[in-house]
Amino acid sequence: MPSFDIVSKVDMQEVDNAVNQAVKEISQRYDFKGSKSEISQEKDAVRVLADDDFKLKAVIDVLQSKFLKRNISIKALQYGKVEPASGGMVRQLISVQQGISKEKGKEIIAVIKESKLKVQAQIQDDQVRVTGKNRDDLQGAIQLLKGKDLDIEMQFVNFRE
């Protein structure tokens, strides 16, 4: 039976490159002169530190533009709350989502079941496997999911006959 997997993966090397480009741009931009704004990367997250909320928004805009230029979807980012930091500064943690959560997996399965396509979907760890009798149904499921806005970056991989 033909099948494919729905995954949500982000290339962390591209994230690292985007963060480095954003750091370089912030260090060279005129509107950030004298500012202590900084971006640091952790394992699966990016920490942004800025003087105030306005500068924080500007730093995040720079970071998002670099992500888009490197073909990293903004949907893969989850923004933490803005917290105060020492010296009157503000900090925000932006986590990079890897894998599909159980809730999103259930949402994807519900969308597929509502469509009445002749396919079955099941959650496997951090991905969703979709199987069907013929390839046309599977391609219909892919088109259906691409058309829906599920607030998650999806890739369709491992298409098998």
UniProtKB/Swiss-Prot annotation:
One of its GO terms (molecular function) is nucleotide binding. GO terms for cellular component: cytosol. Keywords: Nucleotide-binding. It holds the Pfam family DUF520. The keyword Amino-acid biosynthesis does not apply. HAMAP family: YajQ. Nucleotide-binding protein. Belongs to the YajQ family. This is Nucleotide-binding protein Ppro_3093. It comes from Pelobacter propionicus (strain DSM 2379 / NBRC 103807 / OttBd1).
